């Protein structure tokens, strides 16, 4: 039996539709993502913790779901909003249709609403808190109360909530059309030891590091600098993650200690913001953030434009940059800061997602730059 669903924003705007996931309610910050494909990667990206994701492309679910496309061990998005769910999922990799996948993971989702209207509203007013209720008779008053009660992401430290509980090793490379996901590589074949902080790390980031010869020790978000330095890493990676970077004082303190050494540092997304904060810069909450796979970014060093994947609601304030941070990348949508590099240390970061998943790979050479810094560090240490 088809069940009703209702999305209510904190300003009182209502969207009536059809439930395509679990029965119940979901509360979070409502954002929109412009990616045409990759809905499963988006749902399982830890950076979407406490967020309800609106997908602007009208047809979502065409290719179903499969195990290989998951970016983490669970769905982290609080809820899903789409225009149309196809009747049939058709793809040679499909193992489960999207609706069944959402129900199995207990994710509340709504379809058959005007996502263009919702996106325009979020773009004009900014990201809003919202509530989806799915069931026989969704209560609009209750949904509004829940939406207004949600505290928002400002000041919310979510990295320590989504991080791994235990340190683990990662040596698996990237998926290929010919072979699918490969077996884990032997550590003897991976010359560079990189410690990766898991603030909400996506698996494809880890795979792309392995592709470049890194054997990874993935550590919890609150791991101290002293513990990491005892591991004798050739490089330290700061992952993506959800929430506000400013409350992550444990990470900022650790990064400041790493910056007293010459060990190469590479940060992505939240890791980028944390490197900036540890260097003395400030971060700000954006109006509606960047979420999608079609964002143009200018590489200031090479004077070229890259199309990138983005997923963030906070940004580094360029006006707050200290003298030892130089700008390497800027958004061509709104001019916000996208990349920084320390002038006195082998440390750099990027706001977007060079690993894509989903999205283009124009920014993938940033991983190669990290390897170059690691090789230089190892040479100087001899």
From Swiss-Prot:
GO terms classed as biological process: 'de novo' pyrimidine nucleobase biosynthetic process; 'de novo' UMP biosynthetic process; glutamine metabolic process; L-arginine biosynthetic process
Residues binding L-glutamine, per UniProt: 47, 241, 243, 270, 273, 311, 313-314
Stretches for region CPSase: 1-189
An example Gene Ontology CC term for this record: carbamoyl-phosphate synthase complex
Subunit-structure text: Composed of two chains; the small (or glutamine) chain promotes the hydrolysis of glutamine to ammonia, which is used by the large (or ammonia) chain to synthesize carbamoyl phosphate. Tetramer of heterodimers (alpha,beta)4.
Homology family: Belongs to the CarA family.
NCBIfam families attached to this UniProt entry: CPSaseIIsmall (TIGR01368), PRK12838.1 (NF009475)
Entry protein name: Carbamoyl phosphate synthase small chain
Organism whose genome encodes this protein: Salmonella typhimurium (strain LT2 / SGSC1412 / ATCC 700720)
């Amino acid at each position: 039996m088809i069940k009703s669903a209702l999305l209510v924003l904190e300003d009182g705007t209502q969207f009536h539709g059809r439930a395509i996931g679990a029965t119940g309610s979901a509360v979070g910050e409502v954002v929109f993502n412009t990616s045409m494909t990759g809905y499963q990667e988006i749902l399982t990206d830890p950076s979407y913790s406490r967020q309800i994701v609106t997908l602007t492309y009208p047809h979502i679910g065409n290719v179903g779901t499969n195990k290989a496309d998951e970016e983490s061990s669970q769905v982290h998005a609080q809820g899903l909003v789409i225009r149309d769910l196809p009747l049939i999922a058709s793809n040679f990799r499909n193992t489960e249709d999207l609706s069944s996948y959402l129900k199995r993971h207990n994710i509340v989702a709504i379809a058959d609403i005007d996502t263009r209207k919702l996106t325009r509203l979020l773009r004009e007013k900014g990201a809003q808190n919202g509530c989806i209720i799915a069931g026989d008779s969704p209560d609009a008053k209750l949904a509004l109360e829940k939406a207004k009660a949600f505290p928002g992401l400002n000041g919310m430290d979510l990295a320590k909530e989504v991080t791994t509980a235990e340190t683990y090793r990662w040596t698996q490379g990237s998926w290929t059309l010919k072979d699918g996901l490969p077996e884990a590589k032997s550590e003897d074949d991976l010359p560079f030891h990189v410690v990766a902080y898991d603030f909400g790390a996506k698996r494809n980031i880890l795979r792309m590091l392995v592709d470049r010869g890194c054997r990874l020790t993935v550590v919890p978000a609150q791991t101290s600098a002293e513990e990491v330095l005892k591991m004798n890493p050739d490089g330290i990676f700061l992952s993506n993650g959800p929430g506000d970077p400013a409350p992550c004082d444990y990470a900022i303190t650790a990064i400041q200690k790493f910056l007293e050494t010459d060990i190469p540092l590479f940060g992505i997304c939240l890791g980028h913001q944390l490197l900036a904060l540890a260097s003395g810069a400030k971060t700000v909450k954006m109006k509606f953030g960047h979420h999608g796979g079609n964002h143009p970014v200018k590489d200031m060093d090479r004077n070229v434009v890259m199309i990138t994947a983005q997923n963030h609601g906070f940004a580094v304030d360029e006006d707050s940059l200290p003298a030892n941070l130089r700008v390497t990348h800027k958004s061509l949508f709104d001019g916000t800061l996208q990349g920084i590099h320390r002038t006195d240390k082998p440390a750099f970061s990027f706001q977007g997602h060079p690993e894509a998943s989903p999205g283009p790979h124009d920014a993938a050479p940033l991983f190669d730059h990290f390897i170059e810094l690691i090789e230089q560090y190892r040479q100087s240490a001899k």
